C-alpha cells in the first residue's frame, strides 16, 4: 500500500518534469492529425510542407490553388516531418533522396488512405501529402456536366468497342470522370472491366483494378499488354504516356474492346495530333477514336459568404469547382475529312470559352477566375 501511494504521488511530478524535447515528440502526432483533419474539412486535395531556412511553410492545394496555412518552427517541423515519414513507412532519417509511401487512414483517423511523397530541395526537404477523394464515387449526372455531355458519355459507355479519350492539364478532373464512368459501367453490369491506374484512388465494386509499380517494372504498357490476356471487355488506362501504350489502346479499341484513357493535350485537335505522332498506323487511330472530352475546372463562388471571406472557403471567396468542357464525337464523314486533311478540320461541340461565359452569366464564378484558368 505504501508503495502504491508513493507511486501515485510521484506521477504528477514525472508529468510536469517532461522535457521540451519529449513534449515536442508527443505533440507531433497530434499536429499531423490536426493538419489532415483541417485539410479534409476544407476539401483540400494536397498538403504541402516545405522547409525554408529555420522553418517549414505549410500550404493546402484547395480547388487547384495553393493557399498558405501556417508556419512551423524548425524543431516542430523536424518532428512533424519525421512523424509523417514514419506513418508512411519511409526512412525517417533520409532527406537527400525522394521517397514515396502511403499512410493507412486508420492510423490518423482520416477519411481515406493518404499518399506521401518527399523530395530534397535547395532550401530543405519538401513533403506533399495527397488526400484521396471521397470514397463515394459521383455519378456522371453529379459532375455538373451539361446534359449533352452526359448523354454523349452514357451513349459511348453502352457501346461494345471504341476509344474514349479524356484530356486536360493535371488537376482538371479527368480521374474523377473516369471513376464516374466506372461506376456507370458497374451499375450497367454484364461486363468484365479492368483498369490500369497510378495510383488506385477509389475502389469500385465489380471492377478489376490494377495499380502500376514502376519500381518493379510494372508500367502502363506492360500492365495493359498482359491484361488483354485476362479477357477484358472494357480496358481503362489511367494515362497514355508512351508509344507502346498508345498502340495497345488503339489496337484494343479496334478488336472489340471498349477503351477509356487520358492523354495530355491542350485541345480535342491536340489529342489527335499527339496520338497520330505516337502511333504507327494513322488510319487505325482515326478509326479507333469515338469520343474526345477536353476539360478544365473553374472555382465556384463560395455560396456561404458571397464573396466576403469566411471559414468555409478559408478566406478565398471560392468553394468547390465546376467543369468547363468541350467535346468531339467522331462520325463517319468526319473520319474521312481527318484522313484527307488532318486534325485541323476538327471543330469541337461547345467550347471552353463558351462554357465559361455561361457560368459568368449565372454568376457562379467571376472574370478573374476565368482568366486564371483559360488565360
Label every model-predicted segment:
Residues 2-375:
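Short, flexible helix-loop junctions that flank or precede catalytic/ligand sites
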Amino acid at each position: 500500500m505504501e508503495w502504491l501511494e508513493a507511486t501515485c504521488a510521484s506521477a504528477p511530478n514525472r508529468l510536469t518534469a517532461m522535457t521540451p524535447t519529449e513534449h515536442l515528440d508527443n505533440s507531433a502526432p497530434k499536429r499531423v492529425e490536426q493538419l489532415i483533419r483541417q485539410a479534409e474539412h476544407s476539401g483540400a486535395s494536397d498538403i504541402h510542407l516545405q522547409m525554408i531556412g529555420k522553418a517549414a511553410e505549410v500550404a493546402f492545394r484547395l480547388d487547384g490553388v495553393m493557399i498558405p496555412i501556417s508556419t512551423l518552427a524548425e524543431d516542430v517541423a523536424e518532428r512533424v516531418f519525421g512523424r509523417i515519414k514514419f506513418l508512411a513507412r519511409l526512412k525517417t532519417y533520409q532527406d537527400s533522396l525522394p521517397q514515396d509511401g502511403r499512410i493507412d487512414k486508420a492510423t490518423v483517423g482520416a477519411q481515406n488512405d493518404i499518399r506521401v511523397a518527399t523530395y530534397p530541395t535547395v532550401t530543405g526537404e519538401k513533403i506533399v501529402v495527397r488526400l484521396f477523394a471521397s470514397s463515394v464515387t459521383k455519378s456522371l449526372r453529379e459532375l455538373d456536366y451539361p446534359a449533352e455531355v452526359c448523354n454523349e458519355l452514357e451513349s459511348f459507355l453502352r457501346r461494345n468497342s471504341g476509344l474514349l479519350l479524356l484530356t486536360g492539364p493535371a488537376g482538371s478532373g479527368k480521374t474523377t470522370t473516369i471513376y464516374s464512368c466506372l461506376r456507370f459501367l458497374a451499375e450497367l453490369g454484364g461486363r468484365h472491366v479492368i483498369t490500369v491506374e497510378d495510383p488506385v484512388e477509389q475502389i469500385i465494386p465489380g471492377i478489376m483494378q490494377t495499380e502500376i509499380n514502376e519500381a518493379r517494372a510494372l508500367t502502363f504498357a506492360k500492365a495493359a499488354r498482359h491484361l488483354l490476356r485476362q479477357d477484358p471487355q472494357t480496358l481503362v488506362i489511367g494515362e497514355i504516356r508512351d508509344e507502346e501504350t498508345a498502340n495497345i489502346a488503339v489496337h484494343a479499341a479496334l478488336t472489340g474492346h471498349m477503351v477509356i484513357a487520358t492523354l495530355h493535350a491542350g485541345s480535342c485537335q491536340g489529342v489527335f495530333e499527339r496520338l497520330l505522332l505516337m502511333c504507327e498506323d494513322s488510319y487505325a487511330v482515326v478509326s479507333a477514336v469515338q469520343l474526345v472530352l477536353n476539360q478544365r475546372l473553374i472555382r465556384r463562388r463560395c455560396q456561404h459568404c458571397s464573396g466576403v471571406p469566411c471559414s468555409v472557403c478559408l478566406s478565398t471567396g471560392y468553394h468547390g469547382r465546376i467543369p468547363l468542357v468541350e467535346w468531339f464525337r467522331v462520325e463517319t464523314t468526319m473520319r474521312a475529312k481527318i484522313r484527307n486533311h488532318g486534325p485541323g478540320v476538327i471543330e469541337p461541340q461547345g467550347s471552353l470559352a463558351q462554357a465559361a461565359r455561361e457560368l459568368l452569366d449565372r454568376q457562379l464564378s467571376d472574370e478573374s477566375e476565368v482568366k486564371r484558368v483559360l488565360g
